[in-house]
């Protein structure tokens, strides 16, 4: 059974407060099982005061610009944030398993409250087939139980789900706006293929928001 790509957004992170931090990749933070396969997020340790400064909740994003050849690329990693008073203020500690991704064991970075992240989840782990847009379900991420509301998704050919189309089947309908069509002129309409508002085994991506 194929994985669902579950995209989780945090509606409370619209006004993020980025801050410069020093990141250290250390031995006492272990890589998480399933981390490399995208089934969970890596863990970081952060001082409670740094976490408060970032306005972070359970998740923190660390971002750097890394030189690759003749160009700079953005590297962004989302973490499960665990508080530790032993970590100095202004620092974030994470696993040495991320050295290759970041390119160094100590570096300056920008950190902020995570806006959204994606996980690969086995369909057998979460029984979402038959659920519809607006339904809630619980997903555990690194021991954190998240209450999630389904907001949309897409199938294995990229056709998006629409909340106003009943059922799980594909339909060709006249659209005036997203999802499924973005007009370039006022009043423009097009017939497009979309999925209904019910999740089937043909869905590959499920979009959700955290409900508190």
UniProtKB/Swiss-Prot annotation:
Origin superkingdom: Archaea
GO cellular component, one term: ribosome
InterPro entries linked: Ribosomal_eS6 (IPR001377), Ribosomal_eS6_arc (IPR020924), Ribosomal_eS6_CS (IPR018282)
UniProt keyword terms in alphabetical order: Ribonucleoprotein, Ribosomal protein
Signal peptide location: none
GO terms of molecular function: structural constituent of ribosome
GO BP annotations listed: translation
Keyword tRNA processing: no
Record bears the keyword Ribonucleoprotein: yes
Coiled-coil residue spans: none
NCBIfam families, sorted: PRK04290.1-1
Family: Belongs to the eukaryotic ribosomal protein eS6 family.
Full protein name: Small ribosomal subunit protein eS6
Organism: Metallosphaera sedula (strain ATCC 51363 / DSM 5348 / JCM 9185 / NBRC 15509 / TH2)
Gene: rps6e
